[in-house]
Amino acid sequence: MNCKIVGYEFKSLEVILAPGETFYGERRSIVYVDAAIQREVEFNATSNGVAGKLGGIVKSALSGESILILKFYNPTSTDKKIVLSGSCCSLFPIKLQGESLICRKGLYVASTNKLQLNINLTFSGIIGGFFQKMTGEATVFLDSFGTPIEKHLSVGEVLDVDENH
């Protein structure tokens, strides 16, 4: 799989899927997809069964993400292209290696593997609200206003971040 951010002022994500590869994206992020790419709608749920799906629906509604996520699959013998974009002007890739990322709700655009998407409710100081928590092993592409600031926290270190940034 080859992922490349293209564009100058308004960024898009070009994904070349080799035969047999999969990719995940937010339903509203599609710009265009080669016709041969199979798309499968999956529930954004962390567990199976009715209770897991209902929990996924509630979490999705609170986190600002779609209840459904798209799984793209290339069933052909040649490379195929997907182009995705966020609603803002920039995309920011972050590689997760089994750890969690907490960010503003609604920023998830796509990922190289399926992630566990949850809500993170925060009541810290005067700032509180619903944030989104992503956990798994994937490169995640987030919607971004301007240039993001990446901050790795030490054990026990805490930052108060306004939910609008």
Predicted regions and their residues:
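Phosphate/adenylate-binding glycine loop and adjacent helical scaffold
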Residues: 1-165
